[in-house]
Amino acid sequence: MNEWLAGQIVHRFIQFSRGERILGYLKKINQIPHLSTDRIKEMQLEKLQKTLKIAYNNIPFYRKLFDESNIEINNLRLPEDFEAFPILDKDTIRVNYSDIVNQKIKKRISKELTSGSSGNPLTVVKDRDKSAYARAVMYRCYNQYGIEIGHKQARFWGIPTSPKYIFKEKFKDEIANRIRLSAFDIHEKSLVDFTDKIKKFKPRYFYGYPSVLHKFATWILDKGHDLKELNLLAIITTGEVLYNFQRQAIETAFKCKVVNEYGCTEIGILAFECSEGNLHIMADNVYLETVSSNKSKITSQIIATELNNEYNPLIRYNIGDMGVISECSCSCGINFPVISSLAGRDSTFIVTPDDRYINDAILEYTFAQGIKQFRAVQNSRDSLDIKIVRRPELADRTMDEYKKKLVKYLGTSIKIQYEFVPDIEPEKSGKLRYFISNIE
């Protein structure tokens, strides 16, 4: 579709029909990231107090929790007082979801399903006003790289299997001016198909899982293909932890900057990478905090509270990720705090029999040259099964060095089994995780 038509006509019509004020919000919030740090903190506190008051006065589930926690919402101090409020997990939200609704607000809503990396997807109900603000935040992020509403997107994502949802997603892709390249079935023929479709469609930017984009990139490099004529504005990765080796391969293959997006279906974009490489928290839409985990002394659990949702706000919601939040002076001009370290799901730690928790990034650092792809699965504390797709140039001696290095990090109490395979299939979600922990 013509980009002007997609952005100026189709998008505006859809926005109007859904009752979403995306463009209005976008104009209103554009300069917020450049406010002073003190003003941003004041704004967060004001929004948080408003959210808590609405939740207390209109949502019985939250009123009960506030009363039990003895929280005085009229004189809230951050973060001291807020820490008394219990942390909610996905199971708690799922069980009580119908009660976490402001019955005084009658709005049109939409439903979305989380990807369910934990195996338990959550149906999320969103009111259109909340969705509009979240989308405005998204476009504000994308605007940093010259991406405008209506620009063509190549989306490396999952494809529904139900005929009903296949039609729905195709319609959404059409009006969003994007093509969808399946993350579910990646092989030689599909990668050739990716290339042909991309050349014909001429997208302005890529969006998708880093593991899928990395696999496409390594194939492009192996085949000697050249797609630099696309002149992409950016390649946005999301849905998984982005590893350095993935970033390097993708940028080399497509001659374009990779930008990391961190978010969740429940809330939207939580943080976005700036031109200087910092992952800035969208502090006008979400309040993020970290809580120390018993599992790791290095990183902490990321806890999120929505700031613009009067209908069914998530308050102190455990995202399920681990990270470190810090304030820094960034030369990009954005004064939002940053996530200085993001470890992904708290299940992405290799657990040893002697109760050590080792971030799965150790696998990335161990398997460097000569390995095309790998997946490690831990089913018990004393075992780790690793599948490896090796490149022709991987010498046995080099592989032996990798094995010794991993033993050095993990110790001898954990038995490591290796299997060389021709390919590694993605999961049902379309993601290609490099480490899967099945330890409770």
Describe these PLM feature segments.
Residues 138-173:
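Conserved AMP-binding loop of ANL adenylate-forming enzymes
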Residues 206, 310-311, 315-412:
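AMP-binding/adenylate-forming catalytic core of the ANL superfamily
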Residues 153, 178, 258, 288, ...:
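Generic structural signal for residues in well-ordered beta-strands
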Residues 55, 114, 153, 206, ...:
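Residue-level signal for inorganic ion chemistry
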Residues 136, 189-190, 321:
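Active-site glycine-rich loop that binds ribose-phosphate moieties when present
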Residues 1-113, 119-134, 139-152, 195, ...:
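Nucleotide 5′-phosphate-binding alpha/beta core
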Residues 50, 159-282:
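Conserved adenylate-forming
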Residues 233, 242-329, 346-348:
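Conserved AMP-binding/adenylate-forming
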